[in-house]
Regions:
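Extracytosolic (periplasmic/ER-lumenal) interhelical loops and adjacent juxtamembrane/interface segments
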Residues: 56-60
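Membrane-embedded alpha-helical hairpins and interfacial helices in multi-pass inner-membrane proteins
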Residues: 28-33, 41, 61-162
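Hydrophobic transmembrane alpha-helices
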Residues: 1-47, 51-54
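Hydrophobic residues in alpha-helical membrane-spanning segments
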Residues: 47, 51, 55, 103-104, ...
Length: 162
């Protein structure tokens, strides 16, 4: 039992660290009205391990803080990632194309309002939904599905114990 808890925490911490590093490395395209947050491709990891749900939340929280995001962005952006990751976990046994939808939808519905009210972006909300949505489709949909394809080969070795 203790070994499972250690494995769960270790996987969550590693996923959080990966999210932070990817957010930092790709910072120029990870923030703003038009953004492609490469780290969001990791939101497919709840398909493989439940440890990804808290790991992604903590990673997004730390990534937003270290990226200099405003407090509402830190809070609501991280909640969007948490909701998306939890949704992916709930859909993990469905078609993988459905499993990547929750983070896309969560970010489309939350992030445009953060951009408007935290950063004062004057673009129309529907346009912000479109730009955030395109970035999420690229990161979660395209890159996330590529990650699923690669990880499916090694899932029993990487995620077998959580």
């Amino acid at each position: 039992m203790r070994d499972k808890k250690v494995t769960f925490l270790t996987q969550a911490a590693m996923i959080a660290a990966l999210y932070v590093v990817l957010t930092f490395v790709f910072a120029p395209i990870s923030f703003g009205e038009v953004q492609i947050r490469i780290a969001e491709m990791l939101t497919v990891l709840p398909i493989f391990t439940p440890a990804a749900v808290p790991g992604l939340f903590v990673g997004c929280l730390i990534g937003n803080i270290t990226g200099g995001a405003m407090l509402p962005d830190v809070i609501f952006g991280s909640i969007a990632t948490l909701v998306g990751a939890a949704g992916t976990y709930c859909l993990r046994n469905t078609n993988r194309f459905f499993a990547v939808l929750p983070p896309i939808v969560a970010n489309i519905l939350i992030v445009p309002f953060v951009l408007r009210y935290a950063y004062g972006v004057v673009l129309p909300i529907p346009f912000l939904m479109l730009t955030v949505g395109i970035g999420e489709v690229v990161s979660c949909g395209v890159l996330g599905n590529c990650l699923i394809t690669v990880l499916n080969r090694y899932k029993t070795r990487i995620f077998s114990r959580a």
